[in-house]
């Protein structure tokens, strides 16, 4: 507990909250260009080939973003929309690519949870 004299000398500092997605600069999404599309293996105990892309954002950051859903058309020079949200079993992947916008098409033949994968309602 500080004394009154100590509080006069230097006031209490507010607790600064640290963002989990600094590359978005406080925006809900950011546009970017894919520089590399590849697969990586998840941490133990999971095993798969997770599709990720290295993306150069309009904010100037170069990030690794996860490509959700089964199958994708993303390749180098694709323009994509990136949102926050980490992938728990991929260290260093703190962003998701938004499917169904810009160059990232929606997931083919998706019936449930369509809004998360950019799929229109089937006729």
UniProtKB/Swiss-Prot annotation:
GO CC annotation, single: chloroplast
Compartment(s) of residence: Plastid, Chloroplast
Signal peptide: none
Keywords: Chloroplast, Plastid, Ribonucleoprotein, Ribosomal protein, RNA-binding, rRNA-binding
GO molecular function, one term: structural constituent of ribosome
Biological process, per Gene Ontology: translation
InterPro entries cross-referenced by the UniProt entry: NA-bd_OB-fold (IPR012340), Ribosomal_uS12 (IPR006032), Ribosomal_uS12_bac (IPR005679)
Pfam family, any one: Ribosom_S12_S23
CDD domains given in the database record: Ribosomal_S12
Protein role: With S4 and S5 plays an important role in translational accuracy. Located at the interface of the 30S and 50S subunits.
Assembly mode: Part of the 30S ribosomal subunit.
Similarity annotation: Belongs to the universal ribosomal protein uS12 family.
UniProt-listed NCBIfam families: rpsL_bact (TIGR00981)
Name the UniProt record assigns to this protein: Small ribosomal subunit protein uS12c
Organism of origin: Oenothera elata subsp. hookeri (Hooker's evening primrose)
